[in-house]
């Protein structure tokens, strides 16, 4: 993530960042000297190992998805979702600590509304696009909407915040379908 064109919302498999460098530039071989093929890597990837990958007729070695040990079907199976949530939490946490025992945060409807706006600020910042050298990079998440934050008072002196963070969809598999149309449009 030292590249300004990459954000925490990007998958490690992002090809636009460039190919791997160093020891990962060569396709691995097993002890018998056979080059590692994608079928082995796909099996390791399904078992949640981090593996390199390449694309036919496309130069370079790249990294496969950043797998984590979430349950099957869970929202945190890709590292980019974990990083987005962690970044949001790192930005919200100091705001929450600053409100401890602060009477500006109380159980009145006006205070709850004001503090929903206050705690949504980091999410609004993460949703903004940025333009670098004429290229626009989307925000890391969708802009927050009404209802994306809930304030709950389980006791008189304790508050719980629930916040929804929605990352943008991003393709990890692209299928191209081409159809040949031989109609005679000149007739």
Give the location of each predicted region.
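Extracellular Cys-Trp
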Residues: 1-17
């Amino acid at each position: 993530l030292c590249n300004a064109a990459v954000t925490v919302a990007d998958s490690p498999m992002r090809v636009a960042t460039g190919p791997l460098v160093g020891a990962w530039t060569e396709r691995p071989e097993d002890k018998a000297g056979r080059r590692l093929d994608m079928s082995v890597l796909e099996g390791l990837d399904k078992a949640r190992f981090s593996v390199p990958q390449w694309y036919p007729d496309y130069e370079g070695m790249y990294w496969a998805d950043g797998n984590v040990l979430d349950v099957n079907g869970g929202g945190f199976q890709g590292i980019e979702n974990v990083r987005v949530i962690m970044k949001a939490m790192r930005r919200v946490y100091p705001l929450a600590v600053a409100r401890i025992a602060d009477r500006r945060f109380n159980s009145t409807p006006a205070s709850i509304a004001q503090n929903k706006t206050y705690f949504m600020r980091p999410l609004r910042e993460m949703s903004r696009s940025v333009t670098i050298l004429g290229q626009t990079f989307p925000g890391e998440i969708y802009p927050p909407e009404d209802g994306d934050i809930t304030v709950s008072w389980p006791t008189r002196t304790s508050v719980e915040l629930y916040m929804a963070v929605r990352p943008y969809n991003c393709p990890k598999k692209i299928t191209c379908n081409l159809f040949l149309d031989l109609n005679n449009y000149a007739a």
